[in-house]
């Protein structure tokens, strides 16, 4: 399966590299504004409420941002409004472990397969004994966090936070209210981490790993931050605005492959079928998507569907990508 994912991602990146974004700035702006106007009044979905602080977030927040691989930034809506990054953080912690320890570390410690279970499933851990998971569901994500190098809890945490900031192009901070709220209610994740420890995938300090994981999910971001992070992946690991090579380009396909197959929880297959875009959602209301070689896009809107994905974000990203030819599999015959 891992070899398949490598080939899958390589095909995406190669196909995307043969095409460029043909639309003018005015056409890109128009695509964003059309999606904003089309979906701003829909009433579907509801905020996540299993984390009390998320239930209180303004459900009317709706911001869209797109960053091209040549560093052009397009935005509309509530672009300054911040939400907690939540599970989108998993993408970038996975990327950090890849950089520090190589691709085999991901496959060997938590796997790269979709589990067929909900993102915080204990059943999946027991069924697969902690293997055959992936870094974008909670068992794999907490394991990935436990693998980040550092001599102390603070050193590990600062390394993760600074890493996220390099993708976003600015220093990021933590929403302390969300962090406390999640910490008070994360007993399930504590249980998951102990199981992963029992099966030998987390090597040491499972509860510390859970605590750091909870803090990484509480990082505040706006739509522009998320689009910049996605665009860095779209640009082969190089931030298109700061110009910094944040991660090795060779590691980007591994990240995109898991995003494509497991990025939107139970609806990952449906999403990929309709858009072709590697993506990742978070229960804070954000979704990022990557059109390799073209752009990164992000939408923030807290109301979620039953799968835990932002309703507006899915619709808006699909429309914008369709308008801009973002699907890497949509290739015309020559």
What is the meaning of each model-derived region?
Residues 24, 32, 234-334:
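Structured C-terminal helix/loop/strand segments within mature extracytoplasmic catalytic/sensor domains
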Residues 23-64:
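Beta-lactamase-like hydrolase cores
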Residues 68-72, 291-294:
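Short acidic-glycine loop/turn motifs at beta-strand connectors
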Residues 64, 71, 83-107, 229, ...:
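Active-site SXXK
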Residues 54-57, 132-134, 184, 276-280, ...:
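Short Gly/Pro-enriched turn/cap motifs at secondary-structure boundaries
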Residues 1-23:
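Gram-negative bacterial Sec-dependent N-terminal signal peptides
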Residues 64-66, 288:
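Short beta-strand scaffold segments in enzyme catalytic cores
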Residues 24-34, 42-44, 97-216, 232:
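Active-site-adjacent helix/loop patches that line small-molecule binding or acyl-intermediate pockets
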């Amino acid at each position: 399966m891992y070899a398949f994912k490598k080939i899958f991602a390589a095909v995406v990146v190669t196909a995307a590299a043969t095409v460029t974004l043909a639309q003018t700035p005015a056409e890109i702006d128009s695509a964003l504004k059309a999606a904003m106007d089309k979906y701003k009044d829909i009433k579907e979905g509801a905020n996540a409420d299993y984390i009390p602080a998320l239930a209180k977030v303004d459900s009317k927040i709706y911001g869209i941002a797109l960053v091209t691989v040549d560093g052009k930034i397009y935005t509309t809506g509530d672009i300054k409004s911040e939400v907690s990054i939540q599970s989108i953080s998993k993408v970038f912690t996975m990327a950090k472990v890849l950089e520090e320890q190589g691709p085999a570390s991901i496959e060997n410690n938590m796997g790269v397969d979709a589990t067929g279970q909900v993102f915080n499933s204990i059943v999946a851990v027991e069924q697969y004994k902690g293997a055959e998971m992936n870094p974008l569901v909670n068992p794999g994500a907490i394991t990935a966090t436990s693998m980040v190098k550092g001599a102390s809890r603070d050193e590990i945490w600062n390394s993760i936070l600074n890493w996220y900031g390099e993708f976003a192009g600015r220093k990021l901070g933590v929403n302390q209210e969300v962090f406390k709220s999640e910490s008070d209610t994360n007993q399930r994740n504590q249980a998951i981490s102990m199981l992963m420890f029992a099966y030998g995938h987390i090597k040491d300090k499972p509860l510390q790993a859970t605590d750091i994981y909870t803090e990484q999910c509480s990082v505040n971001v706006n739509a522009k931050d998320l689009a910049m992070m996605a665009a860095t992946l779209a640009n082969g690991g190089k931030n298109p605005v700061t110009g910094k090579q944040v991660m090795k380009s060779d590691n980007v396909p591994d990240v995109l492959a898991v995003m494509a197959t497991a990025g939107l929880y139970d609806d990952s297959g449906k999403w990929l079928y309709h858009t072709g875009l590697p993506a990742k959602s978070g229960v804070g209301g954000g979704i990022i998507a990557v059109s390799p070689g073209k752009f990164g896009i992000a939408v923030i809107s807290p109301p979620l569907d039953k799968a835990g994905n932002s309703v507006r974000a899915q619709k808006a990203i699909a429309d914008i990508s369709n308008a801009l030819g973002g699907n890497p599999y949509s290739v015309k015959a020559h």
